[in-house]
Each structure stands twice: as C-alpha cells, then as structure tokens.
Amino acid sequence: MPAKNHRRAFGLKILNASHHGVRQLKRDGAVAEIHGNKFWNSSYLIMDYLKKTPLPKRSRVLEIGCGWGLLGLYCAKQFGNRAHGIDADKNVLPYLDLHADINEVRMTREGKTFNQLTTDYLRDFDVILGADICFWDEMTRQLF
C-alpha cells in the first residue's frame, strides 16, 4: 500500500511533506525561513468556526501570516470569497500556489510583513484572518 502523502479536511486536500510537489519545491529552493515548513493545525479551529458561522459570499478575505494558505483557500472554496494571503516569508508562497492548484481554487498572495500593513491597504478587505501568527512575543507588538 503506498504511503499517504496528503489528508483531507474541511473540503481541502492538504499535502504532507512526502508529497512529490512539496518535495520538488524544497529541491527548487523554496525552504521556509520563519516556521512555514508545514500546514499548522491551528487553522482547523478557525475553519470549524467558519463552517458554523459562514462568511458572506464574495467577501474579500485577507489571511495574514498565511503560510501555505489553507485558511484563505478554505474561504475561497467554501464561500466563494476572494482570498489574498500575505506572509513575511516569501519562500512559503509557492506552497500556497501548489495547494491552490491541487484544490482548484484561486488565491492571490504576496510577501509582506505586519509592519507593512497600512490602513489604506486593509480597506480593500472585509475580513482579516490569521491562525497562529504570533509565535514570537515581539510579533504581538507589530499587530497592536
């Protein structure tokens, strides 16, 4: 029986490190520098909440500290939201693209830090989501 290289949750296919696409990205040099080396389960909590309390259709969603982007992809796939992800580590963005392709969902993304978020930038979004984004104490100061 072949090794399982992905799992399914909340209507999404989530790749494991053993998936050939993930391994190829690593070989190509997309090595995470700030804890974006995998999908973090904390996004499940928000997905579970959103499943019970859905976002309005076509909401403009910003996922901050998106990593592999599964939270934004969930919103795009389940609610038809327009999702955009930002992460300080540009090396994780190819993993978001891979998951978007595998899940047949469109999500835009860019490398950006919390300090680069301005009021004008945030006005373009209806909802801001982030899961497990303050893993260092000094990161909370940047958000508040």
Where are these regions (language model features)?
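S-adenosylmethionine-dependent methyltransferases
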Residues: M1-F144
